[in-house]
From Swiss-Prot:
Protein name (database record): Multiple epidermal growth factor-like domains protein 11
UniProt entry tagged with the keyword Disulfide bond: yes
Recorded family membership: Belongs to the MEGF family.
Superkingdom of the organism of origin: Eukaryota
Lineage of origin: Eukaryota, Metazoa, Chordata, Craniata, Vertebrata
Encoding gene (name): Megf11
One function term, GO molecular function aspect: scavenger receptor activity
Organism: Mus musculus (Mouse)
Extracellular side: 19-847
GO cellular component terms listed in the entry, alphabetical order: basolateral plasma membrane
Length: 1091
């Protein structure tokens, strides 16, 4: 994006979020900033010229030099000013609005101005937290409430809002039995004889019951009234929920189940005897025996198995070398020749035995663990056997002493030490008991078979055993023609072109032949494949054994040689009528019936049996899925049940159709789904009715309108999902929240237009005006003569006194006093500040003092003029006024939203403006042609035939013109004012100028800011400050008001500029003049004014 576009976008975003200076809560202040400008100055240079002289050698022409000046330009810094908008004190910025800030939250109202709350009806106090107490109501809480039994009194109407459980006009009556709650509208739900509290509806349960509705028994561990009594039962005993009597669990007895069953008994009520032996103890609850050490079993009847001892026989004996272990203690009883706690110590050293340990052991040392120290018997290592441990385990045995039998199967080898199996080819598994899975063979079944066409694979070597009809190593080759059977070793014996099956050698005869080898022709009267068809010829000499074509006798024709007789006739001379029914035809010879498809019987009077159809009822029906029975007896078509279609009645009716053959159209509306069987509708959430055309009743939603809406304040809810559609003035998920402050209406989408601190109704947006204001938006003050809330109170002020529109306070006219200004008063300035006479009237009463002051002022002006003339002469001597004449040049382009200076040029008047460094007086001089005019509130100076242009009318009543450099000369200044007041702010920021001619029009600069306003109903009138000596002294009022700006003519000692600023509607709080053409400041460079 181009930089200019980025800048424009940033500016527009700032403008969109900026404060509106028109907002009454927006204040502004000026701030300075420096900009680089180009300014002109007089640059000296040496100019050579020629003149006539007496130099005869140069033909009377001499060269001369002189210092001349030309206009040059240089860059300099200039201080400029811009206005920054910000929220006034007591307000904070929220988006592009200034919102009032209340230190204390308005509890029942809204903040309308700093620390000022507008309370809702019935509330008061600084933070709207104080309402009428419970005993009073009405205006000023002056009426006493009549409500009883803790009822609330409406602070506005005094109506009693009964507490739950009471009724009546004054809430003096309790709810009727069986009812409770607010307005006694709720029915009690208590069970088991419980009573209901009329206030809360709380059930007062009978002893032994609890729960919200007393529907539950007391929880375990409690009983009695309110289930407050703790059960004394111990060890899991349960008490009666009413009496508290204990029912003990098995194994416990006593009043509180604190005593276990006596020894030798157990179970419920300790009624069972213990069955334990050998001193075993019985568990008093379950009866399980806890055996003593050395015994085990359900009844402790078994001694610990060999090699174990101790409690539950859980410990392993540690006796070696054949030592026996005590089943109770685990102590070892050693064999002769061994000693020690575990019998692990030999009496003879290793390798010796016999008396005196003198005989060497005869065992094979590599395969022997040890030899017996007494007998010298060898103890072999696992996998070895024999007297001297020199023989490996025999086949089928392994381990210590070769005592363990091998478990390997199917010819597998067993490892003599570990007993692990090495399987033969074709088997797998830990003991080689699992044959190879189909398709695998070899050691560990690791190879994959390659047999095809159902051939079986040998699990040993993978060789293929082919099925009948196949041959080859992988059974992929079919038997050659003429052979069949296993390995294709059999020869076919089929004749007459019959095909031989390669699997079993059976012959598939061609039509007209039969027999095992197809060597026999079809018998007379038959034909076709396997001679299964019978010839149907009348008056024929048989039929073709292959095709079945009839060989008719002479005189007969037709497919069956029966076309002689007409239809329906048979017998001699076709004299007998056929009796066949249902479209059957009869034989012309004997009248036998040939039934039409779908019928059977001698006269074709019966339909096909269920499950068959067609000619001769020979064709089986297809499998009809959802039908009324088998297929149609003629066509074989399935007769579908309502809701199904398709050749097999296995298709559900398409959407929108139902009934028999799916011929009926569904009538379900609003996305309801239709049953394909009977057309009944299953409605979409939000709809009910036979055809789903009825919306859910108000207050219900969802499927079958089952759910109840939770919306409040008159909101409607969506019949589909229960979403609330709030009425105007409400928001939130269930429409329980009022619109936020300053918003109202549908979806809180309207902004309140109330002014002057008025409150806005959150539903209608109607303004409730503060005291002293009226109008639709409370934009109007009370009309003269009225005041107060709604401007309904009449002022009681007398003698032309002014009435305050808010409080009704009277401001008396001169000469009166009192609350209603009905008392006469002395005309003295010191007595009444509201009746102080104007400065003009004081001047008339003290004319002598005024004349004296004027004489002194004129003398002072003469002295000042002399000083300025002397200073100006010195400046001319230094050559400061040699810069060429400079015309006004706008520093930037004016836009339709800014003000412009029209016909801005230099005046031909001789009047000059200057500034005095000592007395800070702004003055303009010229020949005196009119009387002096004091620029104050009562004596405005008028502008003659001039106006200030503004291109558009939509502007605010405040505008500023800043004189930021020295005084300047402006003529032909024209201003067209809108209907509002127009303010011009003059600021002097330059160095002092020198007077040019006598006669001054001065402004005192002890306050450097002056505001001139104009009532725009009148245009400016003529008044030229060029002939008289008029001054503005603002020491008495630093913001003296000038009804019309005067015409000022000036001579500028240096480059100056004029700044005109239009109000900002929605601009940035910092409006920078040199930035964009839409800026609200215009800067004009002002050149040196000439006389």
């Amino acid at each position: 994006m181009a930089p200019s576009a980025v800048g424009l976008l940033v500016f527009l975003l700032q403008a969109a979020l900026a404060l509106n200076p028109e907002d009454p809560n927006v204040c502004s202040h000026w701030e300075s900033y420096a900009v680089t400008v180009q300014e002109s100055y007089a640059h000296p240079f040496d100019q050579i010229y020629y003149t006539r002289c007496a130099d005869i050698l140069n033909w009377f022409k001499c060269t001369r030099h002189r210092i001349s000046y030309k206009t040059a330009y240089r860059r300099g810094l200039r201080t400029m000013y811009r206005r920054r908008s910000q929220c006034c004190p007591g307000y904070y910025e929220n988006g592009d609005f200034c919102i009032p800030l209340c230190t204390e939250e308005c509890m029942h109202g809204r903040c309308v101005s700093p620390d000022t709350c507008h309370c809702e009806p019935g509330w008061g106090g600084p933070d709207c937290s104080s309402g009428c107490d419970s005993e009073h109501w009405g205006p000023h809480c002056s009426n006493r409430c009549q409500c009883q039994n803790g009822a609330l009194c409406n602070p506005i109407t005094g109506a009693c809002v009964c507490a739950p459980g009471f009724r009546g006009w004054r809430c003096e009556e309790l709810c009727a039995p069986g009812t409770h709650g607010k307005g006694c509208q709720l029915l009690c739900q208590c069970h088991h004889g419980a009573s209901c509290d009329p206030r809360t509806g709380e059930c007062l349960c009978a002893p032994g019951y609890t729960g919200v509705y007393c529907e539950e028994l007391c929880p375990p561990g409690s009983h009695g009234a309110h289930c407050e009594l703790r059960c004394p039962c111990q060890n899991g005993g349960t008490c009666h929920h009413i009496t508290g009597e204990c029912a003990c669990p098995p194994g416990w007895t006593g009043a509180v189940c604190a005593q276990p069953c006596p020894p030798g008994t157990f179970g419920q009520n300790c009624s069972q005897d213990c069955p334990c032996h050998h001193g075993g103890q019985c568990d008093h609850v379950t009866g399980q025996c806890h055996c003593t050490a050395g015994y085990m079993g359900d009844r402790c009847q078994e001694e610990c198995p060999f090699g174990t001892f101790g409690f539950l026989c859980s410990q392993r004996c540690d006796c070696h070398n054949g030592g026996q272990c005590s089943p109770a203690t685990g102590a070892c009883e050693c064999e002769p020749g061994y000693k020690g706690p575990s019998c692990q110590e030999r009496l003879c050293p290793e390798g010796l035995h016999g008396p005196g340990c003198t005989l060497p052991c005869p065992c094979d040392t590599e395969n022997t663990i040890s030899c017996h120290p007494v007998t010298g018997a060898c103890t072999c290592q696992p996998g070895w056997s024999g007297h001297y441990c020199n023989e490996s385990c025999p086949a089928g045995y392994y381990g210590n002493g070769c005592q363990l039998p091998c478990t390997c199967q199917n010819g597998a080898d067993c490892h003599s030490i570990t007993g692990s199996c090495t399987c033969a080819p074709g088997f797998m598994g830990e003991v080689c008991a699992v044959p190879c899975a189909a398709g695998t063979y070899g050691p560990n079944c690791s190879s994959v078979c390659s047999c095809s066409n159902g051939g079986t694979c040998s699990p040993v070597d993978g060789s293929c055993t082919c099925r009948e009809g196949w041959q080859g190593l992988d059974c992929s080759l079919p038997c050659p023609s003429g052979t069949w059977g296993l390995n294709c070793n059999e020869t076919c014996i089929c004749a007459n072109g019959a095909a031989c099956s390669p699997f079993d050698g059976s012959c598939a005869c061609t039509p007209g032949w039969l027999g095992d080898s197809c060597e026999l022709p079809c018998p007379d009267g038959t034909f076709g494949l396997n001679c299964s068809e019978h010839c149907d010829c009348s008056h024929a000499d048989g039929c073709d054994p292959v095709t079945g074509h009839c060989c008719c006798l002479a005189g007969w024709t037709g497919i069956r040689c029966d076309s002689t007789c007409p239809p329906g006739r048979w017998g001699p001379n076709c004299s007998v009528s056929c009796s066949c029914e249902n479209g059957g035809s009869c034989s012309p010879e004997d009248g036998s019936c040939e039934c039409a498809p779908g019928f059977r019987g001698p006269l074709c009077q019966r339909i096909c049996p269920p499950g068959f159809y067609g000619h001769g009822c020979a064709q089986p029906c297809p499998l009809c899925v959802h039908s009324r029975g088998p297929c149609h007896h003629i066509s074989g078509i399935c007769e579908c049940l309502p809701g199904f279609s398709g050749a097999l009645c296995n298709q559900v009716c398409a959407g929108g159709h139902f009934g028999q053959d799916c011929a009926q159209l569904c009538s379900c509306a609003n996305n309801g789904t239709c049953s394909p069987i009977d057309g009944s509708c299953q409605c979409f959430p939000g709809w009910i009715g036979k055809d789903c055309s009825q919306a859910c009743p108000s207050g219900f939603w969802g499927s079958a309108c089952f759910h109840t809406c939770s919306c409040h304040n008159g909101a409607s809810c969506s019949a589909e999902d229960g979403a609330c559609h709030c009425t105007p003035g409400w928001t939130g998920l269930f429409c329980t929240q009022r619109c936020p402050s300053a918003f109202f209406g549908k979806d809180c989408g309207h902004i309140c237009q109330c002014q002057n601190g008025a409150s806005c109704d959150h539903i209608t947006g109607k303004c409730t005006c503060r005291t002293g204001f009226s109008g639709r938006h409370c934009e109007q003050r009370c009309a003269p003569g009225t005041f107060g809330y709604g401007c309904q109170q009449l002022c009681e002020c007398m003698n032309n006194a002014t009435c305050d529109h808010v409080t009704g306070t009277c401001y008396c006219s001169p000469g009166f006093k009192g609350i209603r200004c009905d008392q006469a008063a002395l005309m003295m300035d010191e007595l009444n500040p509201y009746t102080k006479i104007s400065p003009a009237l004081g001047a008339e009463r003290h004319s002598v003092g005024a004349v004296t002051g004027i004489v002194l002022l004129l003398f002072l002006v003469v002295v000042l003029l002399g000083l300025f003339a002397w200073r100006r002469r010195r400046q001319k001597e230094k050559g400061r006024d040699l810069a060429p004449r400079v015309s006004y040049t706008p520093a930037m382009r004016m836009t339709s939203t800014d003000y412009s200076l029209s016909d801005l040029s230099q005046s031909s008047s001789h009047a000059q403006c200057f500034s005095n460094a000592s007395y800070h007086t702004l003055a303009c001089g010229g020949p005196a042609t009119s009387q002096a005019s004091t620029l104050d509130r009562n004596s405005p100076t008028k502008l003659s035939n001039k106006s200030l242009d503004r291109d558009t009318a939509g502007w605010t009543p405040y505008s500023y013109v800043n004189v930021l450099d020295s005084h300047f000369q402006i003529s032909a200044l024209e201003a067209r004012y809108p209907p509002e007041d127009f303010y011009i702010e003059l600021r002097h920021l330059s160095r002092h100028a020198e007077p040019h001619s006598p006669g001054t029009c001065g402004m005192d600069r002890r306050q450097n800011t002056y505001i001139m306003d104009k009532g725009f109903k009148d245009y400016m009138k003529e008044s030229v400050c060029s002939s008289s000596t008029c001054s503005l002294n603002s020491s008495e009022n630093p913001y003296a008001t000038i009804k019309d700006p005067p015409i000022l003519t000036c001579k500028l000692p240096e480059s100056s500029y004029v700044e005109m600023k239009s109000p900002v509607h929605l601009g940035s709080p910092y409006t920078d003049v040199p930035s964009l053409s839409t800026s609200n400041k215009n800067i004009y460079e002002v050149g040196r004014c000439l006389t």
